[in-house]
């Protein structure tokens, strides 16, 4: 028989039937690598907009495979089977927060009346999938009214109106509020805790953010109140204690200078509370009493004091600045003297410069608040207090998902040694830097 040869480099184009068989083989390989639960989880969380069609194909593969496992191959005679194929019907699955149409297979019982439910189809219609995906999109900047516009295949799919999206967001965000309120902190030491408040439509949200021994930032809790008062702050801190927060070890509490926060921290931590007043807030408070022409000189003098490595030298610099302010405006001098020593706590502890910049201000928690404010900026009407807390928590948790370790985290052991000296009663040498 004569052999057939082809020229080097030439090829024969595969037929449509061969291409379909090849694609089916690849799809089958995907199915063998992942079990149904893993594939459903991948669809609900990891399919991006450009891969929606791929997600639908995998969904069809899941459904067809379940039918084949339960009914056997098409036209195969299986005496012991309990269900049989019953055609197809238009249905819906939720993939990455989108309601998408699909021609789903149907099966029915052979020994009794009624249609059998496909487990994979029920999982792909999970009610938990839509709220979580809606929550992620809303906190990224998609409003309830515009949500339909970003859903792929909306022209072919099922209706997604602002009411259903809003209900999904309420459900998902309420779940996140509960999870945050139930976080446990047993066995975790937070040597540094930031406490601050922010206004949301006439209500105040008090937030606590902790830094672990290895420099990781974690959101601790949120409490809502009419104002930033001591009762609300104390309630937040006592709630954290009830969830395992350790108050028996010295803790550096970074505050913005509000007397209510100061009083609550002292009440809960007692002698273990070491207060660091935010240097940025102190500077702004003093500037409010001065004409703008004096602001550059004030900034220069405060920077020189706050960047000093010796506590006594830094304190002397602030006292010199206070005397200079006395000649300009006595109220400005009084503002600087109020809590002046507490703005130098990190200097007194001998914290290295890189970590000191992180601990000297409330910038870490202010940054989280800025993300939350960006998320809530699209809200046109605040209906109730629960809505404020849900939106604020959603924004703060989005900020937490992007947290990185604080700058200077390698110096955290030095800070821990300095704080622990207070427990032993040895105190700190104001002129000594912790090694």
Residue ranges and their predicted role:
Residues 271-288:
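Inter-helix linker motif
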Residues 66, 150, 168:
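Residues in the recognition helix of alpha-helical DNA-binding motifs
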Residues 2-42, 54, 60, 64-68, ...:
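Acidic/histidine-rich catalytic cores and adjacent linkers
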Residues 61, 145, 163:
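Key DNA-contact positions within bacterial/archaeal DNA-binding proteins
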Residues 2-13, 36, 75-76, 83-88, ...:
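RNase H-like nuclease fold core
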Residues 102, 286-323:
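Metal-dependent DNA phosphodiester-chemistry modules and their immediately adjacent helices/loops
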Residues 129-141:
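Short, amphipathic alpha-helical "recognition" segments used to contact nucleic acids or chromatin
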Residues 141-151:
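Short, charged amphipathic recognition helices of the HTH superfamily
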């Amino acid at each position: 028989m004569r052999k057939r040869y082809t020229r080097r480099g030439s090829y024969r184009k595969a037929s449509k039937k061969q291409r379909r068989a090849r694609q089916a083989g690849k799809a089958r390989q995907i199915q063998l690598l992942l079990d149904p639960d893993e594939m459903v989880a991948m669809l609900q969380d990891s399919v991006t907009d450009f891969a929606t069609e791929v997600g639908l194909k995998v969904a069809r593969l899941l459904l067809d495979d379940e039918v084949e496992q339960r009914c056997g191959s098409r036209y195969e005679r299986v005496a012991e089977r309990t269900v049989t194929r019953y055609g197809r019907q238009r249905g819906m699955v939720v993939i990455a927060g989108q309601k998408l149409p699909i021609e789903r297979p149907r099966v029915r019982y052979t020994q009794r009346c009624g249609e059998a439910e496909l487990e994979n189809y029920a999982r792909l219609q999970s009610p938990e999938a839509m709220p979580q995906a809606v929550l992620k999109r809303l906190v990224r900047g998609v409003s309830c009214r515009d949500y339909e516009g970003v859903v792929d295949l909306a022209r072919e799919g099922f209706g997604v109106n602002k009411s259903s999206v809003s209900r999904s967001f309420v459900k998902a965000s309420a779940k996140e509020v509960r999870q945050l309120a139930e976080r446990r902190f047993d066995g975790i030491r937070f040597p540094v805790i930031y406490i601050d408040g922010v206004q949301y439509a006439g209500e105040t949200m008090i937030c606590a953010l902790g830094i672990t021994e290895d420099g990781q930032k974690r959101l601790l809790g949120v409490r809502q109140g009419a104002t930033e008062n001591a009762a609300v702050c104390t309630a937040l801190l006592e709630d954290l204690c009830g969830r395992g927060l350790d108050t028996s070890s010295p803790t550096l509490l970074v505050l913005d200078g509000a007397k209510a926060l100061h009083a609550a921290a002292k009440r809960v931590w007692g002698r273990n509370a070491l207060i660091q007043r935010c240097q940025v807030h102190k500077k702004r408070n003093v500037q409010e009493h001065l004409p703008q022409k004096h602001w550059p000189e004030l900034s220069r003098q405060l920077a020189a004091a706050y960047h000093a490595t010796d506590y006594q030298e830094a304190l002397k610099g602030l006292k010199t600045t206070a005397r200079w302010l006395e000649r300009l405006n006595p109220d400005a001098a009084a503002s600087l003297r109020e809590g002046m020593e507490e703005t130098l706590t990190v200097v007194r502890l001998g914290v290295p410069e890189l970590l000191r910049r992180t601990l000297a201000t409330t910038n870490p928690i202010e940054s989280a608040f800025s993300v939350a404010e960006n998320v809530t900026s699209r809200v046109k009407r605040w209906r109730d207090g629960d809505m404020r807390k849900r939106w604020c928590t959603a924004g703060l948790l989005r900020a937490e998902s992007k947290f990185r370790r604080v700058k200077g985290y390698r110096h955290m052991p030095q800070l821990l040694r300095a704080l622990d000296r207070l427990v032993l009663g040895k105190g700190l040498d104001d002129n000594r830097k912790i090694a």
